[in-house]
């Protein structure tokens, strides 16, 4: 709970966060279009402005107390994704159907299925964090340093990468899904 809870200032901060977040996304889309049309400088300026908007959004989000611990952030993200697939997109699909937009309703339902997967992923990651099983598993895994590519086989990632000296935080279970 932030010191702004229940105030008009809280609503203003939420609106500022939403507006800056939307502007950032729009400007990245605009940059892609400008690049495709051959306007490199304009694309770069859209991206620069998008980065500014991202920082503005972060400032307002932090003011609202929106950034917690990783475990808290995973729980909040899972709850948000749950709302999106169980309530928001389900309602949007129903409305689109009623208003004669079956193709859009189908897209809303497809995105809802993706949001469900996002929720499941966040909940699995939260379980790993809470059980202290992010960098240690009960069976042998192949761990890869995300910085230099060093490979380690074992039940846990090393504290420090023996090749590049980056911390354990850079290790992940090697995924070869190709």
Residue ranges and their predicted role:
Residues 1-178:
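Non-heme di-metal
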